[in-house]
């Protein structure tokens, strides 16, 4: 066992002495050591109960002949960090989480791991760190939140709360209605109830085979969720106690190229958050998989969009997907379009993908559509290219309700705060393309989410007549014609930084085009005169991050070959 490096032999006497101080006995030194990577934090609705989850998992690990060691990562709640400079720290926290997993697991030579994420950057951060360690790992998330209801019985969620601010600003709802939404949008613990970033990633872990079935959809704080926690604990012990299994189920043997492609395929079928693109590119790099942004459109063309979930369809939430058959039912239906839609990859459960889904079926075709009645014949995400995004940009096509072709005039803002002021003051009109720049990984730094501006646009009734492009990113709760991750970003001299108010911008989602109607001569002239804005910083960590981070087309990973 890997842990023998710290617990076997006379020269490890001091190591065992330290471990005995934590409560270990003689017999424990012959058992596998299991890391329990928790992300308990009282600030986050999806994480404040994870101390109880880890207690259940550790109890089950002990009962199955292994020794659990719990440690914790940090966590940032994107909703609470939204709309102020706290959001600068959200994406960088992914790297800190990955580094902390790698550090603890390797410093103490643990044999296997159960990771307990749930929200936002914590899920991809844990996956990235676990890939560096490459021991058998099962991810078991806290679980999704219940949807809320207003006093009149309308289903709501966090996206409703953000959009309600714009409606209140526009005079469309009263302060009493705003308060009703505030008090009922998030009624329980769990990851926010729609197909936002957290639940998108928790779902994709099922698709990749690194989490057990139900991980993305079984509600938090329910007896069914506890069953899942205990199943995961028993399974990791089965693997850790067997030498051949410890080798067979190393994380990189599960999370390989086929797993990445399966994840993107399920992402397309379910219309996941655009943040999944950023995170899956980063995960691919850690897995040693050669997968690039340009490969995503090829998958999208082969996968039908068969499940719409909030924010794309405000009445449907993760609990509804669970009742309709869950992720396995979606995956089973996907295979009816072609035998090669999903690769029959090994999963951490011991079954292959096709074995795992063989008995799954759709229980409610109003929630999960059949392959013969899709929302769209192509997937719910697209990558756009053109002179405005030479290295690509991302749009969640599942969130578009109006035309998929848009031409409008630019209204430019150097940062999210300036954009929010401009939108609220009425500077943005129908027919405009809102340009928010210097919010990329380097420019922010930290690549803020633009949920506040997009929610204001939707809430003020401009959602079908205004588009938004940014080198920043979007919350999974964003909907509408919102294009993010524009690369190269403004801070590295990208075309988005050269735009001026009044420039004509053309968007054609079905042709994968994002361009500005300028001559080559005009573009060359602007480039010659251009000096990117560099924002002042008073944060040591963000300064380090800005110096090391790559752009969104590479997953915003940190450079390591300095």
UniProtKB/Swiss-Prot annotation:
Pathway(s) per entry: Amino-acid biosynthesis; L-isoleucine biosynthesis; L-isoleucine from 2-oxobutanoate: step 3/4; Amino-acid biosynthesis; L-valine biosynthesis; L-valine from pyruvate: step 3/4
NCBIfam families in UniProt: ilvD (TIGR00110), PRK00911.1 (NF002068)
Known role: Functions in the biosynthesis of branched-chain amino acids. Catalyzes the dehydration of (2R,3R)-2,3-dihydroxy-3-methylpentanoate (2,3-dihydroxy-3-methylvalerate) into 2-oxo-3-methylpentanoate (2-oxo-3-methylvalerate) and of (2R)-2,3-dihydroxy-3-methylbutanoate (2,3-dihydroxyisovalerate) into 2-oxo-3-methylbutanoate (2-oxoisovalerate), the penultimate precursor to L-isoleucine and L-valine, respectively.
Organism phylogeny: Bacteria, Pseudomonadati, Campylobacterota, Epsilonproteobacteria, Campylobacterales
Entry-linked Pfam families: ILV_EDD_C (PF24877), ILVD_EDD_N (PF00920)
Cofactor requirement: [2Fe-2S] cluster; Mg(2+)
Subunit comment: Homodimer.
Catalytic residues, chain numbering: 475
Cofactor note: Binds 1 [2Fe-2S] cluster per subunit. This cluster acts as a Lewis acid cofactor.
Protein name in UniProt: Dihydroxy-acid dehydratase
